[in-house]
């Protein structure tokens, strides 16, 4: 008789061990009713993963341990069912390196009211070995890892990776149990899946709490499929769904749990962003796994982007208790896409769109804004800002300021740039914020990633709000998402065609018009340039950019068309001037603006916030850059 194994892809609510335990116990009941022998649940299924320094609160940790004990005790009434789940484990007799009680990111296997053990540790749980410390992960800040424990025990860490034997109804399987990062072997000297296989594991099980990013599933399939093939045994990957945040980044967890055969091929997978139970049968005689499921069709990149943003925004609003959104609608692509996204999530009656024209806003963008609101069926109003901005300007320039040091009065002057910022702040801090308070709910930040990179936003103006739904989208992503919303989501032209063809412009002065543009960014080039500074694992700098430019390989390295670069910059001098201009902007006031930006729904391999950590420094150009620059300008 085959053992029935189920992967419980559940939604985890970070910081709510009570709700998570209730859900786990429900899934255990369902597993019992359906004759499941082994139920896998995600990593840190009880507390959640991204909790900030809540990990330092003793009362919370004690609750997590108590809820874990409830789960263990509940297996006494579940027949042969073995439940494997992630939770924090605490050893109060020992200390972490920060002086606090010893904490482990651990996997527990419970059956008949007791914990199973592989006999290699002084504990009755499995300790996570690889504690990630990159991007949003900060595991060493809170947890003690297996490598540290091995050193303390004076043992080889490789010998501590042993399989866990589970028996049900007379059938036995040796599970190679791993926690998330232990299966991502590319950058670690220990190959945990292979060690487990060498030590007798018959089936690899990876329980994870792994956030989504674009193309991460492809990498996951490649790594885990390769691990299964190399070990010559099947692998089950169990992930959760839901959202979690670190204060500055909202991460979505896509689930996509799956089963790989011993040949590395994907046998079946769970849906994206949905709770599900993935089942498989283990033949202990044939040492083989069988699934009756099917695999999902691959999604396009923009399809993944849409579903991730929608899910992340929806869950964020639900958890925050926000049922209405107010959005400033300019007639441009960014605010239109944001508006369509929230209408899709909340329905048109719960979205208020406001156009706030000044004397610089063209009839064209005002018409586009109204057409967009009408097509979406949302609430709409127009509140002009010319008079209020002039009033603010007059107050600032005509009100005398007295110097008690110099014993004189003086007055301020308003430059064109200051007046541009007055308009932005009037729209954001006065109109949109006021409407949101009166309408109920919150308002959004419409900044995209390209704008955030160079600080194209105004403090307390357009860089405020409850969240930034498109803050991790480059400009080309925003246009693609707009097309997707028309074609796939609403299946009609809710975003007018003109919004895709009009020249981007802030419309804050007479020099910024939809006719002349006024936007110095060449998005097909600058999107790729800025992305190389931020998202490449080995971050580029002006040194690499100038080197590739001099070699004629820049377009190839950035992934853009060569003629775009040559048309935008006819000579080396103009290219260098542009490069230095944006590099300086990116590393000066733009950093402070990003620090103060609302939380970003994060979907790329590096998002601003606490995924890409920044200090407020001054721009720096390495010595090699100055050498290359001199060489290019003197040729």
Region spans (language model):
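ATP/NTP-dependent adenylation/nucleotidyl-transfer catalytic domains that generate, transfer
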Residues: 3, 173, 232-233, 244, ...
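Enzyme catalytic cores with a strong preference for nitrogen-chemistry domains
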Residues: 1-328, 339-350, 355, 375, ...
């Amino acid at each position: 008789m085959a053992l029935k194994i189920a992967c419980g892809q559940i939604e985890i609510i970070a910081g709510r061990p009570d709700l998570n335990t209730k859900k786990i116990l429900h899934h255990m009941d369902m597993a019992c009713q359906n004759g499941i022998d082994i139920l896998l649940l995600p990593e840190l299924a009880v507390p959640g993963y991204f909790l900030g320094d809540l990990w330092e609160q003793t009362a919370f940790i004690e609750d997590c341990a108590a809820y874990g004990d409830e789960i263990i005790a509940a297996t006494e009434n579940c027949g042969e069912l073995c439940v494997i789940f992630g939770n924090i484990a605490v050893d109060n007799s020992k200390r972490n390196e920060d002086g606090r009680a010893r904490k482990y990111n651990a996997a527990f296997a419970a059956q008949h009211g007791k914990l199973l053990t592989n006999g290699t540790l002084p504990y009755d749980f499995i300790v996570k070995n690889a504690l990630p410390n990159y991007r949003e992960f900060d595991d060493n800040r809170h947890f003690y890892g297996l490598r540290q424990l091995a050193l303390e025990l004076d043992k080889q860490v490789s010998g501590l990776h042993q399989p866990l034997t589970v028996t049900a109804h007379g059938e036995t399987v040796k599970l190679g149990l791993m926690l998330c990062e232990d299966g991502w072997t590319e950058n670690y000297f220990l190959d945990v899946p292979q060690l487990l296989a060498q030590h007798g594991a018959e089936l690899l099980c990876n329980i994870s709490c792994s956030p989504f990013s674009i193309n991460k599933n492809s990498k996951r399939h490649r790594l885990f499929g390769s691990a299964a093939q190399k070990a010559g045994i099947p692998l089950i990957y169990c992930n959760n769904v839901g959202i979690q945040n670190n204060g500055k980044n909202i991460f979505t967890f896509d689930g996509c749990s799956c089963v790989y055969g011993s040949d590395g091929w994907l046998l079946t997978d769970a849906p994206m962003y949905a709770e599900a139970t993935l089942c498989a049968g283990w033949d202990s005689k044939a040492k083989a796994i069988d699934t009756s499921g099917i695999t999902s069709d691959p999604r396009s990149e923009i399809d993944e982007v849409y579903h991730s943003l929608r899910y992340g925004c929806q869950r964020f609003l639900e958890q925050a208790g926000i049922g209405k959104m107010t959005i400033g609608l300019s007639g441009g692509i960014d605010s239109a896409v944001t508006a369509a996204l929230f209408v899709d999530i909340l329905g048109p009656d719960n979205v208020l769109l406001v156009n706030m024209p000044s004397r610089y806003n063209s009839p064209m963008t005002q018409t586009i804004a109204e057409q967009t609101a009408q097509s979406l069926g949302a609430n709409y109003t127009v509140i002009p800002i010319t008079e209020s901005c002039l009033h603010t300007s007059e107050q600032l320039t005509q009100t005398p300021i007295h110097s008690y040091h110099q014993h004189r009065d003086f007055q301020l002057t308003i430059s064109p740039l200051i007046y541009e910022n007055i308009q932005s702040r009037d729209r954001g801090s006065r109109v949109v914020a006021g409407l949101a308070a009166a309408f109920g709910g919150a308002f959004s930040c419409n900044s995209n990633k390209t704008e955030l990179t160079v600080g194209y936003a105004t403090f307390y103006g357009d860089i405020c709000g409850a969240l930034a739904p498109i803050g991790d989208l480059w400009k080309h992503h925003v246009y693609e998402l707009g097309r997707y919303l028309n074609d796939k989501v609403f299946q009609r032209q809710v975003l007018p065609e003109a919004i895709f063809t009009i020249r981007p412009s802030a419309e804050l002065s007479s020099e910024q018009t939809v006719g002349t543009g006024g936007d110095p960014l060449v998005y097909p080039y600058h999107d790729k340039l800025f992305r190389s500074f931020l998202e490449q694992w080995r971050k580029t700098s002006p040194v690499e950019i100038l080197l590739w430019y001099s070699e004629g390989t820049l377009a190839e390295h950035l992934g853009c068309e060569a003629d775009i670069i040559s048309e935008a910059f006819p000579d080396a001098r103009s290219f260098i001037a542009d490069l230095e201009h944006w590099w300086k902007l990116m590393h000066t006031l733009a950093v402070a603006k990003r620090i103060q930006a609302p939380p970003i729904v994060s979907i790329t391999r590096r998002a601003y916030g606490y995924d890409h950590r920044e200090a407020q420094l001054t721009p720096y150009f390495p010595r090699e850059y100055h050498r290359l620059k001199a060489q290019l300008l003197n040729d």
